[in-house]
């Protein structure tokens, strides 16, 4: 049986959070704080290609293969989304992804980008 990495699981949770961010941002356009909705759409659109396993992004994806940095980014970017009702679910999913990234970093896992260079 192959070795299972929690970092890959955290990336999949993060991709689900990106879809929730985009959907919540579209719904949030009709709320009072439109800037949070626009922020969530932009964050979801930028994070999705970085979390998706695309080979041609190469060194750009290296930031998400350092799991401590990925956990801090996911937790930090989710803070503003707690202030608008449609984006709260996405913020919670991003925080779950940050916790899983942190657990995988504590366990000593390394991303695929760094495994290939050894």
From Swiss-Prot:
Location relative to the cell: Cell membrane
Annotated knockout phenotype: Prevents formation of fruiting bodies.
A single BP term in Gene Ontology: sorocarp development
Bilayer-crossing regions: 9-29, 36-56, 62-82, 83-103
Domain of life, per lineage: Eukaryota
GO cellular component, one term: plasma membrane
GO function term, MF aspect, one: heme binding
Keywords: Cell membrane, Membrane, Transmembrane, Transmembrane helix
InterPro entries the UniProt entry points to: Cyt_b558_asu (IPR007732)
Family affiliation: Belongs to the p22phox family.
Subunit relationships: Composed of a heavy chain and a light chain.
Role this protein plays: Critical component of the membrane-bound oxidase of phagocytes that generates superoxide.
Protein name per Swiss-Prot or TrEMBL: Superoxide-generating NADPH oxidase light chain subunit
Organism encoding this protein: Dictyostelium discoideum
Gene name tied to this protein: cybA
């Amino acid at each position: 049986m192959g070795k299972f990495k929690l970092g890959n699981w955290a990336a999949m949770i993060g991709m689900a959070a990106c879809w929730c961010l985009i959907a919540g941002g579209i719904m949030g356009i009709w709320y009072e704080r439109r800037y949070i909705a626009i922020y969530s759409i932009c964050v979801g659109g930028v994070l999705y290609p970085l979390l998706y396993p695309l080979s041609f992004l190469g060194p750009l994806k290296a930031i998400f293969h350092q799991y401590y940095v990925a956990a801090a980014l996911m937790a930090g970017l989710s803070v503003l989304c707690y202030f608008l009702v449609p984006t709260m679910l996405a913020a919670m999913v991003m925080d779950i992804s940050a916790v899983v990234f942190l657990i995988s970093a504590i366990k000593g896992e390394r991303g695929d980008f760094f495994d290939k260079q050894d």
